[in-house]
């Protein structure tokens, strides 16, 4: 019976590998197994095939509802947002990454593109969404869902949260407010600074 491989304690040769694409039928079978593992653990909201030793571009997410990702690709992403993430493959480790509050993806099993948004007021005509008032809790869940989808798609491309932490050195700097906390990487040292203090270091 397959289980999540803890990369802090044992080697997982697939964790940094771009996974092979699979058919929809094979992907659905793998997704069923991933949901079983996720439901048994009860401490995660998403899981990718390589986290349990399967070389297949398949992942599942379960935040607001179960989502299956077979050979997914991010078509568009916008509105960067800093976020602290953990990972079942690196249990107990948490890093700040930069994700996007809005993404559009395409999967193998769906003809239409999927739009995920954690933004309070989605706008600018990208994708489609329901125009209704959202509670703060619902906004938080939608953002978490969008970030989890990005996290799992990263896994399918051999990218982990450790890789994303190193990339959080200010991208699209005009999106950050003066007092927003960002992460600066200088050689091997990574530290948090307010954007107004970090900006001179990256200009």
Where are these regions (language model features)?
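Positively charged
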Residues: 1-181, 185-192, 196-202
């Amino acid at each position: 019976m397959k289980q999540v491989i803890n990369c802090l304690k044992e080697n997982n040769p697939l964790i940094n590998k771009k996974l092979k694409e699979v058919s929809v039928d094979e992907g659905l079978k793998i997704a069923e197994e991933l949901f079983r593992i996720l439901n048994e653990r009860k401490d995660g909201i998403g899981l990718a095939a390589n986290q349990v030793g399967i070389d297949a571009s398949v992942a599942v997410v379960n935040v607001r509802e179960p989502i299956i990702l077979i050979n997914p690709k991010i078509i568009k992403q916008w509105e960067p947002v800093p976020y602290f993430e953990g990972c079942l493959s690196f249990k107990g480790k948490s890093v700040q990454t930069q994700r996007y509050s809005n993404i559009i993806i395409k999967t193998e099993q769906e003809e239409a593109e999927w739009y995920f948004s954690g933004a309070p007021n989605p706008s600018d005509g990208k994708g489609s969404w329901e125009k209704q008032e959202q509670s703060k809790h619902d906004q938080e869940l939608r953002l978490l869902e969008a970030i989890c989808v990005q996290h799992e798609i990263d896994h399918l491309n051999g990218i982990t949260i450790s890789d994303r932490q190193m990339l959080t050195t200010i991208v699209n700097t005009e999106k950050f407010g003066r007092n927003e906390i960002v992460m600066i990487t200088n050689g091997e040292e990574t530290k948090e600074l307010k954007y107004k203090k970090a900006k001179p270091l990256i200009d």
